[in-house]
A protein has these predicted regions:
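Feature captures the catalytic ectodomains and active-site-proximal regions of enzymes
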Residues: 1-304
Length: 304
């Protein structure tokens, strides 16, 4: 498989699977020929510390032990037994340009080692998106992880799935479009794996529980070698394995007591990838969550 030179992640906190209910023209357009799902399984409990931590570390909360209070208080150890994606990439690619631009700064502070030379920034996402776009155009990063927080704020304030929550997803979709345009402006689209992911959803005005509206989330990716497909089975922690695979970096060996991040079936046409293992007994999902029926709203390929 072609190795990507750039991996860019747009994280939308609290969007869950509500993306399919919102007006998201940029999401629909960008990922129309990509791979996507509205039922990626979050980590349990469905809180930001546990979920973003699983994505960046490739392990479950029972292994990384991170939670909101912890990542807000303690910096991530530079010698932690579970290296972040940034540390794994830096070890394999010493000269890589790495960036972490997060509205919720505990992600960068409490989940990313501080000695890696990662370019970082934090402010409200309405201002941060401009800085993200400038960074993409100017630095053409090898790996950029971003987090937009206002959707989660709208869910807490007005209710997840409410009109105002869905409107904020629409606004985040505009930011997604700006970020993708920056990729085009930088001229790196032919070498970029571009991803969007939500950490969790919500119920009422909160989250942390295990209802479908809290635990099922949105993921989508597009790139030159990405196959157009509805991903049958995925856990949000799989973001780590997808990133390493795209950059041509060997992932750790799968272990139920350690690394449980995998490349979901269908994203890439590569029959050498390991068989996707059912980790529902570890993640708390229904066995083979791919059997859960759902409705997609991706714009069809006009050329198909």
């Amino acid at each position: 498989m072609k190795k990507y030179k750039h991996v860019i992640v747009i994280g939308v906190d609290g969007a869950g699977s509500f993306v399919k209910q919102a007006d998201t023209p940029n999401f629909d357009r960008i990922f129309a020929k990509g791979a996507y799902t509205y039922h990626a399984l979050a980590s349990r409990p469905t809180d930001s510390g546990e979920c973003w931590g699983s994505m960046l570390l490739g392990v479950g909360p029972d292994v990384h032990k991170l939670h909101n209070e912890h990542v807000s208080t303690y910096p991530y150890p530079v010698d932690a037994p579970n290296p972040s994606l940034f540390r794994r990439i830096r070890a394999a690619m010493p000269d890589a340009e790495l960036g972490s631009f997060c509205d919720w700064n505990p992600i960068t502070f409490g989940m990313v080692e501080s000695n890696l030379g990662v370019t970082s920034d934090t402010c409200r996402d309405t201002e941060l998106i401009g800085r993200i776009c400038d960074y993409i155009r100017e630095k053409k990063p090898t790996f950029l992880f971003t987090q937009l927080d206002s959707v989660d704020g709208a869910g807490h304030a007005h209710g997840y799935g409410s009109e105002k929550h869905l409107q904020q997803i629409h606004i985040a979709d505009e930011m997604l479009g700006q970020a993708y345009q920056a990729v085009l402006d930088a001229g790196i689209q032919d070498d970029t794996l571009f991803m969007m992911i939500a950490d969790h959803g919500g119920k009422g005005c909160g989250h942390g529980g295990w209802s479908d509206s809290e635990k099922l989330t949105t993921f989508a990716c597009v790139g030159p070698t990405v196959q157009r497909c509805d991903i049958e089975e995925m856990n949000i922690r799989d973001l780590a394995a997808i990133t390493l695979y795209a950059l041509g970096i060997e992932a750790p060996e799968f272990s139920e007591t350690g690394w449980t991040s995998q490349v979901p079936v269908g994203i890439f046409a590569d029959d050498t990838l390991p068989e996707y293992r059912d980790i529902s007994h570890l993640a708390g999902g229904v066995p083979r969550i791919s059997r859960v029926q759902h409705i997609t709203e991706i714009v069809p390929d006009e050329e198909a």
